[in-house]
Amino acid sequence: VRIARAVGYPVIIKASGGGGGRGMRVVHTEAALLSAVTLTRGEAQAAFGNPTVYMEKFLTTPRHIEIQVLADEHKNAVWLGERDCSMQRRHQKIIEEAPAPGIPPRLLTRIGDRCAEASRKIGYRGAGTFEFLYQDDEFYFIEMNTRVQVEHPVTEATNGIDIVQQQIRIAAGQKLAFRQRDIVRKGHAIECRINAEDPYTFVPSPGRITSYHAPGGPGIRVDSHVYQNYVVPPYYDSMVGKVIAYGDTRNQAIARMRIALSEMVVEGIRTNI
């Protein structure tokens, strides 16, 4: 209660061991705080086996911005650019893009350089992502994801660096083959996650895919494990694929994405296409 008063309402209670948008609860009044903590602890224990929770200031109109980094064991670290992952449902990302529109370059350079420096100081090795909430020209650190993320292709598309390949080379003890000044970004990329779920209620839609056709064309990339007659199980995340569109401009990337989604066929189950 004392911490919430100092931070100021609204606050958000988060599960320490959580992820994927689960184990979070927003609290607007002091009267609701203790029950929210209790409920979130119970949810965290059931979902993650860890009842530990923590509290943050809740931002009312933030954007979800993240910085991609690569670091090797030789104290070299670079940041590859930012991604805007603000389009979400149930605190889970649905549409991601790079670069993030409308954020002053000086602010992005400052936060990107800090992320690279932090990676060096903690001795980080591999691919990683620093996640932030962004509001009123300020970045608020959320967490660092120490892995390759679903949305990494939009960064690859705009700077030409294969993040998975670099991660393997780093794991083999190799030095990064480039420095910060060598990284040049070009164009715009957007990713849409394709989920097996009702597009209106978000209820999962497992079952057999009776027909499947992936889109193609200039600037289009599709990452998916499914095929015709594949059975989507009910036990895991509902994502069955992702479509990435690249263009010289944001408008071109959006236009290509719209065409790609109109061409994509996934029948037998419901999807968010």
Which residues does each predicted region cover?
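N-terminal cofactor/phosphate-binding cores enriched in small/glycine residues
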Residues: 12
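ATP-dependent carboxylate activation and anion-phosphoryl transfer catalytic cores
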Residues: 7, 15, 20, 27-273
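Gly/Ser/Thr-enriched, mixed-charge loops and adjacent short helices
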Residues: 1-6
